[in-house]
Amino acid sequence: LDRANGYEEHADTFMRSRHPHIGQKIADEWGRGFTPGATVLELGCGDGVVSQVLVDAGLTLYGVDASPTLLRAFRERFPGVETECAAAEESTYFNRTFDGVVAVGLIFLLPESAQRIVLTKVANALKAGGRFLFTAPREACTWVDVLTKRESRSLGVEEYEGLLHGLGFEVSSGRVDEGENHYFFAVKG
């Protein structure tokens, strides 16, 4: 069973083909909203494209990814960062709380039940006032992932906002990056 939703099998292709800057600008702006040294958990950290701007912003990063191949590349790039090879819905999140959690290009790869588990775990892992940044299409939809040929699904903006409000978040959304990825910004009350 590929806990990485097909990304372990296709890890090398993903690392070669992923646009190196997509997601960095918004993640950089988000990351600079923290005090240097703040703790941030990155779910689905992959080989560290988004992570780079968070490390550059002086944040203390923790990385979780279910693909051993992608995580190996991440560890070579950031040898000082604590990591866990686990699915986001199964990770312990290092048994600690964080100032921020980021999940770019991850949530919609998961089955709906796992998405709900991850959002709940994120709420529990964030300190009061902690911030959560993630991507998913605005529309409720399913599609086939170009790389893995597996089904992806977005629950849609109304469902995500409802779930997040129920978990004690204030939500604002509506930013889109160069790759047409839609970003949700949430702050835990």
Where are these regions (language model features)?
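A conserved beta-strand element that flanks and buttresses the S-adenosyl-L-methionine
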Residues: 102
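Class I SAM-dependent methyltransferase core
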Residues: 42
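Class I (Rossmann-like) S-adenosyl-L-methionine-dependent methyltransferase catalytic domain
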Residues: 1-34, 46-93, 110-117, 121, ...
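Short glycine-centered segments of the SAM/dcSAM-binding site in methyltransferase folds
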Residues: 39, 130-131
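Short catalytic micro-motifs in class I SAM-dependent methyltransferases
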Residues: 105-109
